[in-house]
Structures are given as C-alpha cells and as structure tokens.
C-alpha cells in the first residue's frame, strides 16, 4: 500500500454501530463491563481508548512499524524512552538537538544517574569512540533542529548494534513521508506529533513507533504506568491531519526549495542551512535516505548581529513569530532566545546556534507571497 493510501486508511474503519466513516471521538474515561474481567477490549482510557488506538495503529503503519504509542507531548514520548534505562546507563545524542530534548536529558534524567554524551553525529568516528558496554541508546535527530545537519541512520544502526544499544530517531522534521528510519535500522522512531503529523497547530502530542515486540511491551507499560497519554479529541484531530500529510509535505518541500534558493541570493545573509543544497556537507546522505528535503530552513546574517536578527523576525508580516513548526502556516523563530534558550550559550554556539541564526518553518501558502515577505523584512 502506497503512503497516501496508508495515511488515509491505515488503522481506521467505519464505525460498526453507525457506519460513520470518521473514527468517533470516544470521550469517556471508563467502560462498562458485562462481568468482572469481561470487557470489550477497553477498561480505562489511560490504558487505552478506541480513538487513540486507531491513531496509534495509523502512525505505526505510515512509519512501516508494528506498534505505536501516543503521548501528551513529544517530550512525554522522549520521557518514556529514557525511562527504559537504569542508573549508570549511557546515551549518545546529537549535539544540536531540540532544546527541550536537551533540557529533559540534562535537568531531569541526569540526576538519576543516566549519563548523556552530546556529539556531532556527522562524524561517525566520534560516536564509535564514545560507545561502550554501558551505551544503551543512540539518540538521533535528522535533519537536526535547527542546524539541518543530516545523520546517516543506517551507519548509526551499525554502531548501535555492535554494542547492543537501541537506535532512536526523532523523525519530526522529516516525517515518514520523507524518511522511514525503521527501514534503515532504527529500533524506535519518535515524533512530536504537534508538528507535521498534526499539521494545523492545534494539538500537543507525541508518539513512538517500533517493530520490536519486547520494546513495545515496555513502551506500553511505561505509557500506562506514567499516564502521560493523549486524549480522544486530540487523537481525532491528528487522525484527520494525517489524511493530508502527503499533500501538505509535497507543498512544504516545494516551497522550502524556492525559499532556500531565494535566501542564497540575499546580500544580508551569510549561510543558509537546507539539506537540498549540493554544498550541504551530508547532501548525499540526505539524498539516499530521504525522499525530499523538507520545509525547514535556517540562516545566519553577515556580521552575526543579534539586534538585526531580532528586527527581521519582527518585520515579517506573513511569517508568524512563534514557537513550533510544521503547521500549514509559515513560522519564523530565533532559536537562541526561543527553542534553544535552555541550552548554555557556549554549548549552543559550538553547535552553530549563534545569535543571528533564524529558523523558518515554511508553510503551504503561495511561495511568491512568502518570498516577498522575506524580501521586505531583509531590506
């Protein structure tokens, strides 16, 4: 079954009671049983809910996985993965990852004895150097947020398997429309569903997908025990959003390319970060493991002036200055003071998140209007 067909049909069926083609919103906390232990598959909505269940099957299918689990946020999904570890276990992570991921690793889990290493994963030698018998997870973002670095998923899988570690890939930026990490050797795929999967800036949600039954059992145990689940209304909204994911991603990619190439021509801009450029250091890896280059772009200004960057993000009219990404509307952000503010200045600058870095989430509007907006802001 092709991607667009799966996005619309996987995991969902007409309601047996009414024939409703859309999955009903089962807005209930509990379920009546015919007798003790004699239920219809559902007992309590923290453990499982029919609307959420349909979404979990849908997301698993579009990621070419067997098991899906949805959570109250992307960070709750990350929380579930790290709770699979024990004190003394080690995690090797991308060094320019999302600030919220860095924060939960460093300020929540580090004090429980879990060791985190942050490295440039474009350099596989450095990753291999850090692996040891205590390495339990290799955590990958690709493309990375916000530097758009590309990590070779298949290469990371080989390294992880050598030491018996799990490879977890944050696939938020690419979505399964552009890449399916499980097919490249990943053990777990993570999403901030809030972004492209939901696609309409109206839901906070996270998801995990795996094809390993043992991992899935642990994932569901933690999901139920910790209780950071998503609700039926949000599940319904995401089921609806995913039905157009393939259509939206086509437009995000088209617009992203047009805007990246426009930014390259601006006299005010120093560097443009977008994996579709042949000059991108890992362009060939992106070409190999992705089916397109996405709608996320970052750029820096000549002179690296903070005030100038803040002025530009205020001058735009169509691009909205806001956190988040992946919605149908275009957003602009300043990572150093927004998404990556929780990362110490010296650490973020070492990974490229300098004061003038601006990140764009290119939406599905007409590209010409978006370019015109950027032109006037950069003038």
Describe the function of each predicted region:
Residues 1-42, 292:
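N-terminal glycine-rich, Lys/His-bearing helix-loop that initiates the first secondary-structure elements
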Residues 2-4, 10-12, 271, 326, ...:
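Positively charged, small/polar-rich N-terminal and surface patches that mediate targeting and assembly
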Residues 9, 67-268, 273, 284:
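Conserved PLP-enzyme active-site core in the AAT-like
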Residues 25-26, 34-54, 58-61, 331-356:
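Glycine-rich phosphate/pyrophosphate-binding loop
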Residues 30-79, 83-84, 100-107:
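Conserved N-terminal alpha-helix of the aminotransferase class I/II PLP-enzyme fold
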Residues 30-32, 210-215, 242, 301-305:
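Short loop segments at secondary-structure junctions
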Residues 106, 115, 136, 248, ...:
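PLP-dependent enzyme catalytic core of the Aspartate aminotransferase-like
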Residues 257-326, 343-349:
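Conserved small-domain helix->loop->beta segment predominantly found in fold-type I
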């Amino acid at each position: 079954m092709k991607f667009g067909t799966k996005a619309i049909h996987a995991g969902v069926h007409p309601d047996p009671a009414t024939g409703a083609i859309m999955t009903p919103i089962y807005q209930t906390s509990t379920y009546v049983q015919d007798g003790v232990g004699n239920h219809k598959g559902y007992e309590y909505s923290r453990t499982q809910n029919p609307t959420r269940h349909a979404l979990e099957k849908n997301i698993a299918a579009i990621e070419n996985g067997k098991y899906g689990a949805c959570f109250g946020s992307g960070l709750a999904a990350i929380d579930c993965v790290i709770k699979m570890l024990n004190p003394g276990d080690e995690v090797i992570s991308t060094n320019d990852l999302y600030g919220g991921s860095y924060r939960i690793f460093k300020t929540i889990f580090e004090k429980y004895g879990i060791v985190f290493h942050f490295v440039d994963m474009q350099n596989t030698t450095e990753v291999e150097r850090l692996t040891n018998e205590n390495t339990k997870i290799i955590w990958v973002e690709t493309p990375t947020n916000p530097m758009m670095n590309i990590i070779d998923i298949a290469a990371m899988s080989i390294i992880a398997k050598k030491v018996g570690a799990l490879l977890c890939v944050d696939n938020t930026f690419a979505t399964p429309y552009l890449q399916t990490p499980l097919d490249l050797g990943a053990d777990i795929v993570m999403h901030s569903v809030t972004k492209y999967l939901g696609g309409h800036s109206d839901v906070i949600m996270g998801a995990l997908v795996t094809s390993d039954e043992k991992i899935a059992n642990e994932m569901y145990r933690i999901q139920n025990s910790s209780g950071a689940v998503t609700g039926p209304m949000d599940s319904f909204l995401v089921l609806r959003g995913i039905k157009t994911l393939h259509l939206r991603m086509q437009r995000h990619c088209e617009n992203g390319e047009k805007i990246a190439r426009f930014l390259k021509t601006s006299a005010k801009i120093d560097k443009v970060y977008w994996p579709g450029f042949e000059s991108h250091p890992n362009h060939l890896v992106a070409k190999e493991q992705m089916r397109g280059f996405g709608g996320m772009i970052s750029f820096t200004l000549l002179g690296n002036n903070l005030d100038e960057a803040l002025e530009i993000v205020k001058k735009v009219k169509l691009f909205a200055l806001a956190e988040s990404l992946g919605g149908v509307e275009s957003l602009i952000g300043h990572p150093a003071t927004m998404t990556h503010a929780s990362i110490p200045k010296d650490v973020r600058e070492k990974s490229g998140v300098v004061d003038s870095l601006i990140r764009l989430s290119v939406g599905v509007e007409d590209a010409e209007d978006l370019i015109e907006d950027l032109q006037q802001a950069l003038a």
